[in-house]
């Protein structure tokens, strides 16, 4: 008789093997959440082949780097990369007292057996999140942005330089540092504006409101617009846009303001009348893939990502080391008839800020990591909701490890 009961959820483990098979790194996830007050540490294990390592030491490093764009900028005498953070731990042979193992590490040590060594890498609170500026379709090379890399390698040099690490004995993994929506929302965003036109005794009033402060990626954003036209002019068009503001603060304080979604109505507001209209926008990367300079959440290789999430900065942190700061606002623009009626026009606009983020993930403390439910997957990005596309990753049940 088949056993009854609740089936435990499989826990995907991401692994990568060096070319010479001497070291294999295992991570329980690829996205590490910045809770503002603290950041989830990178916990994992390294499987070492003592025969292939042959007395070398095995290290694991965590690097945060800001890339300025295409690498050919180096010919101008400038560096195209700046390391914002670097840390390294020796995992083999073990040094010092072993720290308390996480539940994930306990399960991996039990499953993988001897020659498996745990490591724990932490993020300081001043680092930016993973973000990049989307290149144009014809651009080649690495994109401008912030990325994080975990690397495991074997070396017989105590303090090896990057170019002296044997590539065949090293393995690199890109991970992401991400932020999710805070548990509590701020006040409901709204804005009011008035304009006085020449030869009009009374103003044109505009009121804009959103239903909440934070919207999740892929969620429709209803924007309620009320136009009170006390002038003798005609409001010919109402256009509502979601604009993304990417502030590259690390090297030049450049601002990139890009509309990522828009809707408009041609319904006119005649003199001495009022119109209330709700327009719904859905900002998606799927509708902006060809546009250079759009900020995206950092991605790994050529897999899916989404529009960059709004940046939350911990109080007291220096903004200039945050790489790229991302924010959003709703812009409402009115086209108003001019002196010659329909033949000419002028435009007025106002803005309402909001946040675009991912929801809080399930509490990891509620998930139990059981060694019999571990599923090993070659390191590759998973699909995200924002893109409007669906791709499947390749999973490897790794039957050979079940013994």
Swiss-Prot record:
Coiled coil: none annotated. Residues 11-19 are annotated as: Interaction with RHO. Residues 381-403 are annotated as: Disordered. The modification Phosphothreonine is found at residue 231. SUPFAM superfamilies: E set domains. Changing residue 198 to A: Abrogates tetramerization, reduces dimerization, does not affect binding to microtubules and to phosphorylated light-activated rhodopsin. It is a peripheral membrane protein. InterPro entries: Arrestin (IPR000698), Arrestin-like_C (IPR014752), Arrestin-like_N (IPR011021), Arrestin_C-like (IPR011022), Arrestin_CS (IPR017864), Arrestin_N (IPR014753), Ig_E-set (IPR014756). Binds to photoactivated, phosphorylated RHO and terminates RHO signaling via G-proteins by competing with G-proteins for the same binding site on RHO. May play a role in preventing light-dependent degeneration of retinal photoreceptor cells. This is S-arrestin.
């Amino acid at each position: 008789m088949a056993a009854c009961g609740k089936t435990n959820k499989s826990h995907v483990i991401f692994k990568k093997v060096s070319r010479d098979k001497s070291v294999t790194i295992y991570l329980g996830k690829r996205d590490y959440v910045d809770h503002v007050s603290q950041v989830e540490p990178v916990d994992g294990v390294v499987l070492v082949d003592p025969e292939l390592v042959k007395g070398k030491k095995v290290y694991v490093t965590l690097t945060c780097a800001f890339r300025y764009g295409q690498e050919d900028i180096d010919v101008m005498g400038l560096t195209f990369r700046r390391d914002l953070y670097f840390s390294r731990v020796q995992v083999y042979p073990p040094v010092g007292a072993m720290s308390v193992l996480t539940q994930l590490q306990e399960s991996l040590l039990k499953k993988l057996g001897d020659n498996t060594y745990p490591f724990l890498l932490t993020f300081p609170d001043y680092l930016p999140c993973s973000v990049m500026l989307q290149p144009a379709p014809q651009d080649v090379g690495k994109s401008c942005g912030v990325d994080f890399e975990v690397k495991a390698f074997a070396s017989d040099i105590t303090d090896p330089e990057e170019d002296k690490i044997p590539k065949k004995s090293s393995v690199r993994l890109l991970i992401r540092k991400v932020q999710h929506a805070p548990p509590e929302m701020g006040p409901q965003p709204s804005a009011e504006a008035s304009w006085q036109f020449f030869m009009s005794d009374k103003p044109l009033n505009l009121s804009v409101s959103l239903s909440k402060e934070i919207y999740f990626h892929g969620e429709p954003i209803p924007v309620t617009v009320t136009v009170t036209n006390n002038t003798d002019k005609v409001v010919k068009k109402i256009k509502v846009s979601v604009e993304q503001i990417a502030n590259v603060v690390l090297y030049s304080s450049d601002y990139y303001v890009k509309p990522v979604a828009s809707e408009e109505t041609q319904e006119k507001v005649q003199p001495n009348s009022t119109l209330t209209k709700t327009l719904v926008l859905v900002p998606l990367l799927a509708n902006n893939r060809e546009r250079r300079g759009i900020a995206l959440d950092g991605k790994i290789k050529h897999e899916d990502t989404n529009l960059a999430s709004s940046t939350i900065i911990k109080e007291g942190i220096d903004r200039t080391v945050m790489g790229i700061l991302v924010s959003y606002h709703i812009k409402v623009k009115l086209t108003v008839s001019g002196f010659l009626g329909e033949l000419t026009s002028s435009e007025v606009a106002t803005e309402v800020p909001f946040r675009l983020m991912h929801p809080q993930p399930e509490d990891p403390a509620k998930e139990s990591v059981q060694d019999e439910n571990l599923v090993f997957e070659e390191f590759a990005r998973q699909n995200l909701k924002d893109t409007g596309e669906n791709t499947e990753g390749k999973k490897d049940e790794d039957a050979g490890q079940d013994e």
